[in-house]
């Protein structure tokens, strides 16, 4: 039996995530935005104030975070640790992008697996009157990272793939779509959610000193191929993958990643230029999990933003 969604949620947010927070609130009359005064002392350390602290007692409270750089994490953690202690009925942390997820293992003694460090920090969020904090994360880099969190919090792992499927259904060549994975990791991660599409799997192989991308299985010839992965940094693998797929006869190549990190404006490698040069990617879909990137790539082809707002609004009702 379906439970009606009737939970009134008060949503706080960090400065960077304001636009996404407004979109989330627009999804449901049950979500009301709240505010925090984000200030700094002269020495740079945060001077924070949670507005209406007494009015949120007994209410369901959530915080939308964006850990875009180490510099902003401390001020947001200060708020995240304070909110559950204000006698709230329940507390939910929404962290769309778990930033240290790609450093999740030690390859030699001395490596520091910062994904585990971040999970331990979040596992120590105080319990609220309603019990442990719920931590909502989208497409965490490695699935085993769910076990890095302690029993003090309840991690909820969501995905942006339904947004991609919805968008692919709207394409004029929806019947010609083939999904490609840049490596076995991406295939293991996403193939079950996309198993109604024909699939292509690429692989990185070592040739001398170089690592090159090869087609491992599947046939992209005559199709619109969409490369799917959880995140992009410099984009080098996607570009190599596109070249291989085009060489094997793909008529169009597009890409989807949930988290467009793009450090040092590396998205510029993908933008369509006006000089008539080859447009390698027809579409490049990303979500708004990394607000800084979304601002930087606004209205730049081939990028299209698929918003997580509706999915976050639903998660807040769980």
From Swiss-Prot:
One of its GO terms (biological process) is 5-phosphoribose 1-diphosphate biosynthetic process. Gene3D superfamilies: 3.40.50.2020. Its EC number is 2.7.6.1. SUPFAM superfamilies: PRTase-like (SSF53271). It catalyses: D-ribose 5-phosphate + ATP = 5-phospho-alpha-D-ribose 1-diphosphate + AMP + H(+). It is found in: Cytoplasm. Mg(2+) binds at residues 139, 141. SMART domains: Pribosyltran_N (SM01400). GO terms for cellular component: cytoplasm; ribose phosphate diphosphokinase complex. One of its GO terms (molecular function) is magnesium ion binding. The keyword Magnesium applies. Residues 222-237 are annotated as: Binding of phosphoribosylpyrophosphate. Keywords: ATP-binding, Cytoplasm, Kinase, Magnesium, Metal-binding, Nucleotide biosynthesis, Nucleotide-binding, Transferase. Signal peptide: none annotated. Belongs to the ribose-phosphate pyrophosphokinase family. PANTHER family: RIBOSE-PHOSPHATE DIPHOSPHOKINASE FAMILY MEMBER, RIBOSE-PHOSPHATE PYROPHOSPHOKINASE 4. NCBIfam families: ribP_PPkin. This is Ribose-phosphate pyrophosphokinase 4. It comes from Spinacia oleracea. The gene is PRS4.
């Amino acid at each position: 039996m379906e439970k009606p969604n009737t939970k009134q949620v008060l949503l706080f947010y960090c400065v960077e995530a304001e636009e996404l927070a407004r979109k989330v609130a627009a999804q449901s009359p049950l979500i009301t935005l709240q505010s925090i005064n984000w200030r700094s002392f002269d020495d740079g350390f945060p001077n924070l104030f949670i507005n209406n602290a007494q009015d949120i007692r007994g209410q369901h409270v959530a915080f939308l975070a964006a850990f875009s750089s180490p510099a902003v994490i401390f001020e947001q953690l200060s708020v995240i640790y304070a909110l559950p202690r204000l006698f709230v009925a329940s507390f939910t942390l929404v962290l769309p992008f778990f930033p240290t997820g790609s450093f999740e293992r030690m390859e030699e003694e001395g490596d520091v697996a910062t994904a585990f460090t971040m999970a331990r920090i979040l596992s120590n969020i105080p319990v609220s009157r309603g019990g442990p904090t719920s931590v909502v994360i989208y497409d965490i880099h490695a699935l085993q990272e769910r076990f890095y969190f302690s029993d003090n919090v309840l991690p909820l792992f969501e995905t942006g793939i339904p947004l991609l499927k919805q968008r692919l259904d709207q394409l004029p060549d929806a019947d010609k779509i083939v999904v490609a994975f840049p490596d076995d990791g991406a295939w293991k991660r996403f193939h079950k959610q996309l198993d109604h599409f024909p699939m292509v799997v690429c692989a990185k192989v070592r040739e001398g000193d170089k690592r090159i991308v090869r087609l491992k299985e599947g046939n992209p010839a005559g199709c619109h191929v969409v490369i799917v992965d959880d995140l992009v940094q410099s984009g080098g693998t996607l570009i190599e993958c596109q070249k291989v797929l085009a060489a094997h006869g793909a008529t169009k190549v597009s890409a989807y990643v949930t988290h467009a990190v793009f450090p040092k404006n590396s998205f510029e490698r993908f933008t369509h230029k006006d000089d008539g040069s080859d447009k390698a990617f027809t579409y490049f879909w990303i979500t708004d999990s990394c607000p800084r990137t979304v601002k930087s790539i606004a209205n730049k082809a081939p990028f299209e933003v698929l918003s997580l707002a509706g999915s976050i609004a639903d998660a807040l009702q769980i």
